[in-house]
């Protein structure tokens, strides 16, 4: 399988990160690789990986290339369990996706809600490692079953933020039938009283925090990127 676009995306994210150590740790976590697994593949000791992730060492271009290739090779040894889920997203952009970001640090649901001034309708403790902002109307009109996986970026442990929703039922039904489950679902521009009971029921069944917020979507993106990305 060809994953050059994946490698370029990961390298770019690490290089542009304000904390390269946290970025390295984040990508290792996304690929479910232990420090020992990665060290074995790179031919170095786990303590060296720890030094890079803690900031005691700064990654150069040569190390970054080896690091990313090692992650992809490890995933290949496991049948591309990680990358096969997200290749559709990486192949092209889609007009239904308004914004997408992977976080440098984990966001807890309560902290996430505070940042976007959201009200949580179902309460579950899930780690949030990114977000995708989705135009619900364009998603309904243009996304097929395979396209839906594009919404998850490089990890399903993210918040799916749906805009232009009327009751929230359609987004939650889509989540219900999908194999990948988000860490949270945000219904933008919708008052809590208008959320469909079935949407809330699905959130309870899937154990997903369901959140509503009414602040401007541009402000939401700016706040989330400033706080977590």
Curated annotation (Swiss-Prot):
Gene3D superfamilies per the UniProt record, alphabetical: lambda repressor-like DNA-binding domains (1.10.260.40)
Limits of the HTH cro/C1-type domain: 24-78
Feature: DNA-binding region: 35-54
Key words of the record: DNA-binding, Transcription, Transcription regulation
Molecular functions (GO terms): DNA binding
InterPro entries documented for this protein: Cro/C1-type_HTH (IPR001387), Lambda_DNA-bd_dom_sf (IPR010982), Tscrpt_reg_HTH_MJ1545_prd (IPR017271)
Name this protein carries in UniProt: Uncharacterized HTH-type transcriptional regulator AF_2414
Annotated source species: Archaeoglobus fulgidus (strain ATCC 49558 / DSM 4304 / JCM 9628 / NBRC 100126 / VC-16)
Top-level taxonomy: Archaea, Methanobacteriati, Methanobacteriota, Archaeoglobi, Archaeoglobales
């Amino acid at each position: 399988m060809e994953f050059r676009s994946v490698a370029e995306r990961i390298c770019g994210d690490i290089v542009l990160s304000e904390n390269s150590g946290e970025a390295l740790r984040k990508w290792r976590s996304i690929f479910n690789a232990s420090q020992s697994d990665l060290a074995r593949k790179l031919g170095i000791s786990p303590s060296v990986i720890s030094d890079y992730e803690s900031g005691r060492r700064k990654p150069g271009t040569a190390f970054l290339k080896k690091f990313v290739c090692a992650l992809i090779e490890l995933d290949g040894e496991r049948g591309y369990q990680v990358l096969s889920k997200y290749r559709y997203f990486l192949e092209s952009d889609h007009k239904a996706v308004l914004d997408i970001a992977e976080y440098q640090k984990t966001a807890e649901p309560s902290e996430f809600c505070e940042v976007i001034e959201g009200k949580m309708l179902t309460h579950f403790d899930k780690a949030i490692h990114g977000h995708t902002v989705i135009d619900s109307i364009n998603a309904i009109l243009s996304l097929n079953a395979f396209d839906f996986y594009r919404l998850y970026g490089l990890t399903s442990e993210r918040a799916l933020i749906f805009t232009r929703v009327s009751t929230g039922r359609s987004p939650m039904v889509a989540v219900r039938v999908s194999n990948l489950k988000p860490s949270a679902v945000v219904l933008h521009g919708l008052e809590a009283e208008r959320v469909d009971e079935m949407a809330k029921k699905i959130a309870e069944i899937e154990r997903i925090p369901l959140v509503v917020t009414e602040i401007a979507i541009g402000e939401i993106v700016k706040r989330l990127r400033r706080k977590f990305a």
